[in-house]
């Protein structure tokens, strides 16, 4: 069942935790790709110095953070790598969840071509290990870039998230500090990174 607006229209930390175990769906090149979300990070603009919208900052880049809950926010790091976020909170309240890791479930052959430009069986163990265990890695595997920024997952067939009743939900959730935000003063110590314990597609234990 596809997640609706009410799922995202809540506290960002709650949404980040509850996205774990849900299935990210991407339709591209006539193929459906699916991955279980195994790692997330929460960002809350008003109080979070790690957020692009800290203190209510609104620019052309950050405007998507203020969009309807369930909207896709894609930004670029290091001038070349993309990161996928899902907007939370009410409209005009800047909150977002960074998707940091997914476990491939369906369409892995197409994912491999997008990620490495070769079939999955040709991949080395190192390439398989680094398939989708990081925000930019999963974007490459799913063919996500700035072109997907602003998509509404509530109605779009390109990208959305679903709750698959067949996926086990009896996992343990680890709470940890977020990654790569040492500049964010006290916010760098917030335990707003969440991941499924012992899942091999988590970017960092």
From Swiss-Prot:
Its EC number is 3.2.2.-. Keywords: DNA damage, DNA repair, Hydrolase. It comes from the Bacteria. It holds the Pfam family Pur_DNA_glyco. GO terms for biological process: base-excision repair. The keyword DNA damage applies. InterPro entries: Formyl_transferase-like_C_sf (IPR011034), MPG (IPR003180), MPG_sf (IPR036995). It is an enzyme of class 3 (hydrolase). GO terms for molecular function: alkylbase DNA N-glycosylase activity; DNA binding. Belongs to the DNA glycosylase MPG family. This is Putative 3-methyladenine DNA glycosylase. It comes from Clostridium perfringens (strain 13 / Type A).
């Amino acid at each position: 069942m596809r997640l609706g607006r009410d799922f995202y229209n809540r506290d960002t930390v709650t949404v980040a935790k509850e996205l774990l175990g849900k299935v990210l769906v991407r339709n591209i090149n006539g193929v459906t790709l699916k991955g279980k979300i195994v790692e997330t990070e929460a960002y809350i603009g008003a109080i979070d110095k790690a957020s692009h919208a800290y203190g209510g900052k609104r620019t052309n880049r950050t405007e998507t953070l203020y969009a309807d809950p369930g909207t896709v926010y894609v930004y670029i790091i290091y001038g070349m790598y993309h990161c996928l976020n899902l907007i939370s909170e009410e409209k005009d309240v800047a909150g977002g969840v960074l998707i940091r890791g997914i476990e491939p479930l369906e369409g892995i052959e197409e994912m491999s071509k997008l990620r490495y430009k070769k079939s999955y069986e040709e991949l080395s163990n190192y390439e398989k290990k680094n398939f989708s265990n990081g925000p930019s890695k999963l974007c490459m595997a799913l063919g996500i870039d700035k072109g997907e920024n602003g998509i509404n997952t509530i109605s779009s067939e390109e990208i959305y998230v679903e709750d698959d009743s067949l996926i086990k939900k009896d996992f343990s959730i680890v709470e940890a500090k977020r990654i790569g935000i040492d500049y964010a003063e006290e916010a760098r110590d917030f335990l707003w990174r969440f991941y499924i314990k012992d899942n091999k597609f988590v970017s960092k234990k």
